[in-house]
A protein has these predicted regions:
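Extended, charged amphipathic alpha-helical segments
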Residues: 190-333, 337, 389-393
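Surface-exposed polar/charged interaction patches
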Residues: 14-25, 29-32, 53, 69-76, ...
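N-terminal-proximal low-complexity accessory segments that begin disordered
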Residues: 1-75
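C-terminal amphipathic alpha-helical
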Residues: 101-121, 255-258, 263-267, 293-399, ...
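Structured, mid-chain assembly/scaffold modules that mediate subunit interfaces
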Residues: 51-209, 371
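Activation/maturation switch segments at domain boundaries
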Residues: 287-289, 296, 339, 395-458
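Short, hydrophobic/amphipathic alpha-helical patches that form generic packing surfaces
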Residues: 61-76, 109-119, 218-243, 313, ...
Length: 458
């Protein structure tokens, strides 16, 4: 009967070769007996549920910062809509403020990163029920917009036409809106939804996620565990780094004589004298007290910094942003890292924000009660402010340079004083962007040419 053992050993070797992890059978790393095997072999039990994600966001500051960092930084200065007409731009800005567009978009993007899916539900007044596609020709107004997450938005029907560019995507959703003690469930067409996702999953994984993305916390979860464990262990080491030792003559004889109460009273008296008199009262002949260093903490800070760097590498967020300051002893973060981070944010603005915000803005523009009365300006576009924040000195220097340029343009006839005034001093504040109404310019030129021709003919 012992014959099958070689067969079992062969199977074990094959399984060891196929395990999706780093394995060292000599040290035990990655094996069932290794101390770090959990950190190397992710399995189905380690997948974060939506409840896990919510708890991490609510009760773990680092997890919340991972989810918040990109949306908050990308939209901290809001966004503007450029049309070439300062008055129209101010009206659009006021309409978007009334919708609370910047805050709603920030939340929806945050929920997308936290849960793998978030969305804006648009209150489009076109006279149709929400389960019907939006009829752009009938839009009276964009009444409101609310942010929801994937738990509130469940795909009901899917696009099954393989010739459609939306093949395999949700066509309608079941939306559950929670409010107070009641909830409301409605069916909503995808044209009334603006989706935000987290990490892009594989095609098969997306099917399991019901068409949504993956939480950004999923990939960083093991690193977060390791970092939290390291900080907790460091706290224990600090508490145990120095231990007080009290030597009492004939202690073993006292214990053998069943005088525990005497020993307890002595220790209590020692603590009281240390707290009240800030000194120790000892028997000069039979007692002594000293503090003993139980271990050095050299190198602990470096190890903890490396764990923070690993979490930073996993999330793509610089340590300066993730932890609020650079790790001690490391030159891993600085201005170059912040610049690279801002470049990443700028790319995310283009990838995640621009098309979604442009859709919201366009629906507001073509609505009959919107800021432009239903007339969509030609050539309008969404613009984002610089991520770099100027100091007061830099701001004053910029304004001085812009004023010099404006004076030159006015002197040469390139701009009019009215155009400069409307461009610089807007309702939302000072702006370095210059807007010129080219249509008005052409109309004025044509009128001047017609007047000149009439004068010459007369």
């Amino acid at each position: 009967m012992p014959a099958p053992r070689p067969r079992l050993q062969q199977i074990a070797r094959v399984l060891a070769q196929r395990v999706d992890s780093w394995v060292n059978t000599l040290t035990g790393v990655g094996t069932a007996t290794g101390k770090t095997n959990v950190a190397f072999v992710p399995n189905q039990n380690e997948l974060l549920s939506l409840v896990d994600c919510e708890n991490l966001y609510n009760f773990d500051g680092v997890a919340a910062r991972i989810c918040d960092a990109v949306p908050v930084n990308a939209l901290r200065g809001g966004f503007t809509v450029s049309t070439g007409d300062a008055e129209v731009e101010s009206a659009i800005h006021a309409a978007l403020d009334a919708l609370n567009a910047t805050e709603r978009a920030t939340r929806a993007w945050t929920w997308g990163r936290l849960y793998g899916g978030g969305a804006l539900y648009l209150g489009i007044d076109d006279g149709l029920p929400p389960e019907e596609p939006v009829d752009e020709a009938r839009i009276r107004a964009l009444r409101w917009m609310v942010d929801v997450d994937r738990r509130d938005l469940y795909p009901m029907t899917w696009e099954t036409d393989d010739a459609s560019p939306r093949f395999g995507q949700p066509d309608t959703y079941r939306l559950t809106r929670m409010g107070g003690t009641a909830s409301e469930t409605v069916t909503v067409h995808h044209t009334r939804i603006v989706r935000f996702e987290g990490v892009t999953p594989t095609r098969r994984r997306r099917l399991l996620l019901q068409g949504w993305g993956e939480s950004v916390l999923q990939r960083a979860y093991m690193e977060m565990q390791a970092m939290r464990g390291a900080f907790a262990a460091a706290g224990v080491l600090i508490q145990e780094a120095s231990q007080g030792v009290l030597k009492i003559k004939d202690l073993m004889d006292l214990m053998a004589a069943d005088t525990d109460d005497v020993i307890r009273r002595r220790l209590s008296l020692m603590d009281e004298s240390r707290s009240v008199a800030r000194s120790l009262l000892l028997d000069a002949d039979g007692e002594s007290y000293e503090r003993v260093e139980t271990g050095a903490l050299t190198g602990v800070a470096d190890i903890m910094d490396r764990m923070v760097l690993l979490l930073s590498a996993t999330t793509g967020i610089p340590v300066t942003i993730l932890m609020g300051k650079s790790p001690a002893g490391l030159n891993a973060t600085g201005e170059s890292d912040i610049r690279a981070w801002y470049d990443t944010i700028a790319a995310d603005r283009e990838k995640m924000l621009r098309s979604r915000l442009e859709r919201v803005v366009r629906l507001a523009l073509i609505s009959r009660e919107g800021p432009t009365g239903g007339r969509e300006p030609s050539g309008w576009k969404v613009q984002f402010p610089s991520l770099w924040q100027s100091t007061p000195s830099e701001e004053a220097d910029l304004r001085a340079k812009v004023a010099t340029t404006d004076a030159m343009y006015i002197d040469k006839g390139v701009l009019t004083p009215e155009e400069v005034a409307l461009s610089r001093f807007r309702k939302e504040g000072w702006s370095a962007e210059t807007t010129v109404d080219l249509d008005a310019r052409r109309a004025a030129q044509e009128a001047d040419a017609a007047a000149a021709a009439q004068h010459a003919g007369g």
